[in-house]
Amino acid sequence: MPPLSLLIKPASSGCNLKCTYCFYHSLSDNRNVKSYGIMRDEVLESMVKRVLNEADGHCSFAFQGGEPILAGLEFFERLMELQRKHNYKNLKIYNSLQTNGTLIDESWAKFLSENKFLVGLSMDGPKEIHNLNRKDCCGLDTFSKVERAAELFKKYKVEFNILCVVTSNTARHVNKIYRYFKEKDFKFLQFINCLDPLYEEKGKYNYSLKPQDYTKFLKNLFDLWYEDFLNGNRVSIRYFDGLLETILLGKSSSCGMNGTCTCQFVVESDGSVYPCDFYVLDKWRLGNIQDMTMKELFETNKNHEFIKSSFKVHEECKKCKWFKLCKGGCRRCRDSKEDSDLELNYYCQSYKEFFEYAFPRLINVANNIK
């Protein structure tokens, strides 16, 4: 097989935070089993062995949640042991982890650094913005713990990105958020659209990101980013980087920006495999990694159905001048009714207005980084 990438949930939906906008919480609430607990050692070894035996060239293990840190440091030390044990083909192995940061201490930071993990740290901006939606299970603020995690990552030279969820509130404070990240010298940023629960009415929650708010957010963020670029202070913002890749290469490395789905091989802690992190539902369970090869999982009827359903292009997109840049966007923003065709992207108008506003400057950046 070609190189393989997995998204793994070692603690299932378990988390020590209770973020108001958590999309995975809403997904797990709609499964027969809300949480599968911590991944057992036999599942971990079976997964590692299978991937290293079947992949060619390199492979990627990306740990998410819930909160993956809840699996414990010993779990990840065991992961490293198993990767060494079963890597007979001498593959290049990439490990990454997404965390809320509240449980990071010196030992965790040291481990992540020594084992070259790329880390995504969830932080929504300065204290008053971050704490609005990201509280722990007791309703307590989490900002100081997350800021401490960032300091430890810098101390131990852990490579990390900042993951910022864009809500109605954060969209209105993009200047304050960007300045804060700049003051902290965070150079790699991902701004992630806040998702309303799947198949619920969009825009009904206080945190819901409405199209008009997203339009303003993109324009304001781009102005700040572009000014820094002109001043020789380039900041990596994943969405803008993805647009530049599309302009220069015809496609993006970011999932959701190429218009059609691929199989992401999302592995729940019991070994169940799903095609996408946004669809870890009983309906889309492909099988179990303990019982099936990666090729068998990929070739299931459910996976083919999931991927094929993303191919249909909306009639509005066919005549849109921005389609080659947008490609219809992420499936999750086109899916509003269960068992029906995908619709026009919820943020279609936002993207149209943003492209009209920013495209000439995007081309200028692209020409300067060729």
Curated annotation (Swiss-Prot):
Binding site for [4Fe-4S] cluster 3: 317, 320, 326, 348
SUPFAM superfamilies: Radical SAM enzymes
Domain Radical SAM core: 1-227
Catalytic reaction equation(s): L-cysteinyl-[sulfatase] + S-adenosyl-L-methionine + H2O = 3-oxo-L-alanyl-[sulfatase] + hydrogen sulfide + 5'-deoxyadenosine + L-methionine + 2 H(+)
Keyword Transcription listed: no
EC id: 1.8.98.7
Required cofactor names: [4Fe-4S] cluster
Residues the record marks as active site: 277
Co-factor binding details: Binds 3 [4Fe-4S] clusters. The first cluster is coordinated with 3 cysteines and an exchangeable S-adenosyl-L-methionine.
Binding residues for S-adenosyl-L-methionine: 21, 66, 122, 134, 195
InterPro entries: 4Fe4S-binding_SPASM_dom, Aldolase_TIM, Anaerobic_Cys-type_sulfatase-m, rSAM, SPASM_anSME, Sulphatase_maturase_rSAM
Domain of life of the organism encoding this protein: Bacteria
Residues annotated to bind [4Fe-4S] cluster 1: 15, 19, 22
PROSITE patterns from the UniProt entry: RADICAL_SAM (PS51918)
NCBIfam families documented for this protein: PRK13758.1 (NF010321), rSAM_more_4Fe4S (TIGR04085), sulfatase_rSAM (TIGR03942)
Similarity field: Belongs to the radical SAM superfamily. Anaerobic sulfatase-maturating enzyme family.
Record function comment: Involved in 'Cys-type' sulfatase maturation under anaerobic conditions. Catalyzes the post-translational modification of cysteine into 3-oxoalanine (also known as C(alpha)-formylglycine (FGly)), by a free radical chemical mechanism initiated via the reductive cleavage of S-adenosyl-L-methionine (SAM).
Protein name: Cysteine-type anaerobic sulfatase-maturating enzyme
